[in-house]
Amino acid sequence: KKEILDDLNYHIIKGELLAIRAYIHFDLLRLYGYGNWSQRDTELDEKRTIPYATEVSKDPAPQYSGAETIKLLLNDLNEAAALLKDYDPITKTKAASFYQEYNEEGFFNERTLRMNYYAVKALQARVYLWRGKNEDIDSRN
């Protein structure tokens, strides 16, 4: 909830969580979603694949088609990248002194070992490659 966290922590925590959700669902799709999409995308786009959980509920998440699942994955990754781009210390868009008051307990230490902005961009590229849509990879950022 945005009203509980300050702006910096909100952007980093929500960005990480969205990226981790996409990462987990992508692994599930790779394991249980009919294999590599790049050679058979038209055949597999309409088949039901995995449930994609976007909220916590006692009811099962709906099972989506391949195209819908990929769209949900990329939406999560795009939102995560947008949240992390200007706030993640690893991007160095802000001076190190900006993070000092927030980093009393070391939360921002070792950003290279966490789901950071560059890990999100790498996962986006991995999804596009697996999907067989290499021309969609955003290499500018």
Can you say where each PLM-predicted feature lies in the sequence?
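Structured, solvent-exposed acidic/aromatic patches
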Residues: K1-A19, L28-N141
